[in-house]
C-alpha cells in the first residue's frame, strides 16, 4: 500500500514493456548513505531503471529544514560514489547523474534559459525548479519575452556563477549572487505554497556555502580537467 508500492508497480510495468526509464532522487543528510548504497543501486537497476538524477536537498520555502543539507563529508563522498558507478569498475548497469556535482560537464548552472527554465503550475516562468522568482508568465508572455525577462537576462549576464563547477548555483554555493539578481530585477516570489523573500532564502545557504568553498576548491584542484565542456555562455 501507499506511494512506495505504487512506484514499484509502475517500475515493474515499465520494465515488462521494455520502456527505458530513470529515477529522480533527492539526497539529504539523513538518506544519502541509503540512496547511494550499492545494494540500493543494484535494486533499482534490477527494477529496470537505466539512469537516474540525484538532487542535493535545497532549503526552499518558509518551512524548509537547512539541517537536512548533506554534510561536507557526505557531499564529497557522493561525488566519488556517483563517478565510481559510472566507471567500468562495476556491473551495476545503472548510470547516475548528479545535478549539483556534475556541473563540470555542462559548464555550471544551466538555468535562467541558458539551457532550461521551469514553469510552475500557475504558469510563472522561473529560472530553475528550485528558484521561485519570476517576472513573466506563460499565460501573458511569449517564450521569447520569457527568455528576455530581466531575471533571466541577469542569469545569462553572470553565468557561470563560479569558475569552480563544484560551486555552480547562485543560491546554494553563491547565495549573494541570487540575492543581487532578484533585487536588481524586481522579480517576485512565485512559490505557490510558501512565498519567501530572497534574503531569507539565501540566508539559509550562507553558512553552507562558506564551509563548502574550501572543500570544493581542494576537490577542483585535484580534478584532471582535460578541457572545458559545453560553455555556451553569453559573449562578454
Specify the residue positions occupied by each region the protein language model found.
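Generic alpha-helical structural signal
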Residues: 8, 38, 76-83, 144
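Conserved short-loop catalytic and cofactor-binding motifs
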Residues: 28, 66, 131
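Short, hydrophobic secondary-structure boundary micro-motifs
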Residues: 23-24, 95, 155-156
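Generic structural signal for helix capping and beta-alpha/helix-loop junctions
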Residues: 31, 61-62, 135
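A C-terminal junction/extension of Radical SAM enzymes
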Residues: 20, 57-127, 168-177
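Flexible mid-to-C-terminal extensions adjoining Fe-S/redox cofactors in radical SAM and related proteins
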Residues: 130-236
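Radical SAM/AdoMet-radical enzyme domain recognition
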Residues: 1-55
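Short, conserved loop/turn and helix-capping segments at secondary-structure boundaries
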Residues: 1, 69-76, 136-141
Amino acid at each position: 500500500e501507499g506511494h512506495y508500492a505504487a512506484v514499484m508497480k509502475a517500475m515493474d510495468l515499465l520494465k515488462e514493456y521494455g520502456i527505458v526509464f530513470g529515477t529522480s532522487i533527492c539526497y539529504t543528510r539523513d538518506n544519502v548513505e541509503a540512496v547511494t548504497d550499492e545494494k540500493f543501486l543494484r535494486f533499482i537497476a534490477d527494477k529496470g531503471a537505466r539512469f537516474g538524477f540525484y538532487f542535493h536537498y535545497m532549503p526552499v520555502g518558509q518551512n524548509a529544514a537547512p539541517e537536512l543539507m548533506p554534510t561536507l563529508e557526505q557531499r564529497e563522498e557522493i561525488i566519488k560514489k556517483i563517478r565510481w558507478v559510472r566507471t567500468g569498475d562495476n556491473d551495476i548497469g545503472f548510470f547516475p547523474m548528479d545535478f549539483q556535482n556534475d556541473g563540470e560537464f555542462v559548464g555550471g548552472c544551466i538555468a535562467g534559459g541558458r539551457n532550461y527554465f521551469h514553469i510552475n503550475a500557475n504558469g510563472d516562468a522561473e529560472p530553475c525548479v528550485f528558484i521561485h522568482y519570476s517576472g513573466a508568465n506563460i499565460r501573458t508572455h511569449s517564450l521569447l519575452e520569457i527568455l528576455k525577462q530581466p531575471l533571466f537576462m541577469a542569469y545569462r549576464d553572470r553565468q557561470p556563477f563560479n569558475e569552480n563547477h563544484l560551486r555552480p548555483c547562485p543560491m546554494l554555493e553563491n547565495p549573494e549572487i541570487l540575492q543581487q539578481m532578484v533585487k536588481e530585477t524586481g522579480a517576485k516570489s512565485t512559490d505557490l505554497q510558501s512565498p519567501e523573500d530572497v534574503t531569507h532564502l539565501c540566508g539559509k545557504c550562507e553558512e553552507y556555502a562558506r564551509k563548502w568553498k574550501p572543500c570544493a576548491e581542494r576537490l577542483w584542484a585535484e580534478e584532471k580537467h582535460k578541457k572545458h565542456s559545453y560553455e555556451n555562455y553569453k559573449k562578454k
